[in-house]
Amino acid sequence: MKFTPIKTLAAIALLCALSSTAYAAKIGDTEFTYGGYIKLDAMWSDYSAGAPAGTSVGRDFYVPSTLTVGNDNSSDAVFDMHARESRFNFGTATLLDNGKTVKTKIELDFLLSAPGGNERVSNSYSPRIRHAFISYDGWLFGQTWSNFQNVGALPEALDFVGPAEGTVFVRQSQIKYTTGAWSFSLENPESTITTAGGGMAVTDDASLPDFTARYTHNADWGNFVVTALARQLTYKVGGVDADETSFGVSASGMVKLGEDNLKFMLTQGKGLGRYVGLNVARGAVLNGDDLDAIDSTSGFIAYQHKWNSQWRSTFLYSFLSADNDENLLAMYGDPTESSQSYSANILYSPVKRLTFGAEFKHAERELESGVDGDMDRLQFSVKYAF
């Protein structure tokens, strides 16, 4: 199919004209879709060991590694409000001459954007890419959720992630092939390594992509997903050339309980690092000229109850435990040993696309030395999906 500038402009004009009542338009053999949501988050957070800096991402949503630890007498409460989770996406689906369909999607939001925004005058923030991919005949090329992650297992929460320390959570460039219940991918590699003194090195020196495999079972009662990951951790700095093989497996799913549902995930691995817990535990420790991968176990369980057609609640528990080598503590400092959180919310949708909600979250983080800290957060949100 050939696209002329006139047809392209016509498609854009039609989408704009329909934006208040519809979110798809078809020009020739191509269907254009547009969607997203606007969301306001207002949060009151009380930290036992003092609040993170105002520029910390942990002030926008719960990130376990940013939870402060230390003196309980440093309790500090802060209030934050933003609309940075708001997002929009644009997609196409084109029927080709061979009878197959090629699809594209791009989605952006405003979280974690580069410096440039501020809260003094304009509160302006740059957009960032969440998804940008092409799919054709079982293949996917581009950036989207890792094949190692089951996005469908994430519970409904007001916090951006929800079970932050307990879930696999990665978006990255990849080549993925899906056939039936199976999917396999080659994904962008990256390593987070603890160096002497507790510093962190983020390296991109792997000679091989990360490899994942996934099996999905769907049934009337819900679904069950098993995923596996194999990757190469590397550190090539200052004359050191070290690498280590890392493995992990994750099981997750959703069980229907009438109108309610139960969602869960359990992940175990060696050197998982950035793949779980928003990188609260690193992938490996530099031990001389070698890398020692860090074992970790993480997971969550969430129950959602529908009070009626407009009101619902999610009750969530999430955890991560890292098995740090105690013999190396003197060299790489005092890393995170465990992180956990629990939350409960109440959500009200007077109409399908509009949601008002309140959520309470309690989170804890403990270092290997026993030093710890906690946070209590009360969050109010309003969201309209379009």
Where are these regions (language model features)?
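Gram-negative bacterial Sec-dependent N-terminal signal peptides
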Residues: 1-24
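Outer membrane beta-barrel
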Residues: 25-55, 63-65, 69-193, 205-208, ...
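Outer-membrane beta-barrel translocator domains and adjoining extracellular loop/strand segments
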Residues: 48-53, 115-124, 151-160, 190-207, ...
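Outer-membrane beta-barrel "beta-signal"
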Residues: 348-350, 354, 374-386
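Detector for outer-membrane/organellar transmembrane beta-barrel domains
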Residues: 219-336
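Transmembrane beta-strand segments that form the barrel wall of outer-membrane beta-barrel proteins
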Residues: 103-112, 182-188, 224-232, 312-321, ...
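Transmembrane beta-barrel outer-membrane domains
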Residues: 79-83, 122-129, 166-170, 204-208, ...
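Transmembrane beta-barrel strand/turn architecture of Gram-negative outer membrane proteins
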Residues: 24-34, 103-106, 227-231, 243-257, ...
